[in-house]
Amino acid sequence: VCIVPMYNVRGALQRNGALRVNQNGPEAYGFRGNARNLDLNRDFMKMDSRNTRSLVAALTRWDPDIYMETHVSDGADHRYLMELLLTHRDKLDPTLRSFANDHLLPGLYTWMERKDIGMCPYFETVDGPPEHGLEGFVDGPRYSTGFSALQGRIGLLSESHMLKPYADRVNATFQLMLATLAVMDQHGEELRTSRMQAGSNTAAAEAFGLNWQIDTTRTELLPWKGYTASERPSAVSGLPQLHYDRSQRMDTLVPWRDHAIPTITLTKPVAYLVPQAWPEVIQRLRLAGVPLDTVNEERTERVEAQRITDFGTVREPYEGHYLHQGVSTTTDTIEVVLHPGDVLVPMGHRTDRLAMEMLEPRASDGFFAWGFFDSVLQQKEWFSDYVFESIAAELLAKDPELRKELNDRRSTDPAFAADAWQQLYWVYQRSPHYEPGHRLYPVMRVLR
């Protein structure tokens, strides 16, 4: 057993008793953000903090069979002392999913029930209080449990209920730790076998699903122990405010959606090519245990090159980044020159899924989404309209098909037809003068 008693060191030292307004004690506690105001349980893919880089390196080196992290919840009121978040089972390899369903979860819930500690799955409310419906949490790889799945292990996260007495929360967390150890002691061999098989399955897989979300078409019923909820006039605003009446217990069944599906599925390449110009990307791959081959001599490779055609960016910074989302790409097969010092990420390993989640530009928690490649999004060279006008006219005169495309665009887009500069830029983008590296994603997919 390896224990990290203080992960967020600077945050733990920022003692206070006021900043967790939803929380019932203790008298003093730490702060969520580290010295750079980063939430470390959003940092596992981007690894901005030294804290996370140290922990990921330790996980890679030690390779535990189960990872467990302890938290305090921040959400709805109910009668359960503990909420349990497990790496979403639909995202796990089938062998690990079976172990979780057959051994881990039954063992944990049975232990906690024997200790008279109420425990429920970690959830998100759908529309108001819990009785209106609950959804499971799809833990992307920015979170410790989602990242653990990509390293081929089950991740657990305890969320003791913030309004329960502090001593009870501590005991519940301790008992869940003991329960986990008991399951591992009893079923350790099955767990190790499951992990080995999961690694082999990942290495042999031809494709992986990415960007998972809750399947809203599948609903079950979950036994629920809560409190009657109602709306009362707010003493502050006078408007309706949610209120839980702890004098009125409620035992019922609530709608429960906890099946996840990927929104895209991508086939594996033979390898990824990461140019040496991106050392911060290579460093993170290495820390996560992804096998790398350094190119020793110049050679040519046939690759799939992706160009970013569209993306959205959040308006407010999140964990030190302006996240990209809704990424669209086009793909071309080209030949590129590999230089000594460039890095190949070969597939055929248990880390294949982790590498794909890091390196694919459409992956919602990948390096492109976190802004690691933002410099390729900026166009460096432009044109003066009075200079390019004659060049554009000559290009159109020599290429009837290009002129037809321009005329078609003008006939279907009135705003475009009324904008002389946009029409020149349209021609410029299709000319030899347009820089080939603009929006060209630097990481290539090797085909051989």
Question: What does each of the following model-derived ranges do?
Answer:
Residues V1-R448:
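Structured catalytic-domain cores with a bias toward divalent-metal coordination
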